[in-house]
Amino acid sequence: TQAWLKHFRDAGVRAVGFGWIFIRDIGDAPSELTFETLDQPFTDPLGPEVEEYFTRMDWLRGSTQEDILESRYAVRPGIALEDVSLADADSGMGFTPKVKRLTRTDGPRFTHDIDDAVASIVSGLNPAGLPLREIVSLWAAANGLADEQEEKLASEAAGIIVDLIRHG
């Protein structure tokens, strides 16, 4: 151990990263490679997260965009909606909103920066409620979007939901 520490010190090494590799046979399906940077604190053990991840990916692999939009979802317990504001330096008083994000408070603690529209849509998710497409449609109607804008929003929402599912 001391020899390695001396080698690192002599070589100017300031940090050593550790990682995980999870491999699963998905049969004849096209190979999938996902690389994640876990530079945030996380909660051990990550083993249960790996199995959940593979389950989520199996579902996503078999789902089309239409399937995503016609499905109903639950927000995972422990998800935090964070609104971060910083002191307003221009006015010298109060705060200015800077970022809104969804953050897992368990496992790998993934975080996603989102906007108000995504926050509203995710807030409407309920496994016994409306499918994603209808939640998007309601949001679009409430915000005066034209049909083509609603279709674009639905497509974008499906992609965002896929990313959120991927991260649990």
Feature-to-residue mapping (PLM):
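Rossmann-like AdoMet/SAM-dependent catalytic core
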Residues: 1-126
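Long, charge-rich, low-complexity alpha-helical segments
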Residues: 23, 107-168
